[in-house]
Amino acid sequence: LPEQDFMRF
């Protein structure tokens, strides 16, 4: 998964 995906949480 992209780095930005975990940033969404």
From Swiss-Prot:
The keyword Secreted applies. The keyword RNA-binding does not apply. Its main location: secreted. Disulfide bonds: none annotated. The modification Phenylalanine amide is found at F9. Keywords: Amidation, Neuropeptide, Secreted. It is found in: Secreted. One of its GO terms (biological process) is neuropeptide signaling pathway. Coiled coil: none annotated. Expressed in the CNS and thoracic perisympathetic organs (tPSO) but not in the ring gland, midgut or abdominal perisympathetic organs (aPSO) (at protein level). GO terms for cellular component: extracellular region. Belongs to the FARP (FMRFamide related peptide) family. FMRFamides and FMRFamide-like peptides are neuropeptides. This is FMRFamide-like neuropeptide LPEQDFMRF-amide. It comes from Delia radicum (Cabbage root fly). The lineage of its organism: Eukaryota, Metazoa, Ecdysozoa, Arthropoda, Hexapoda.
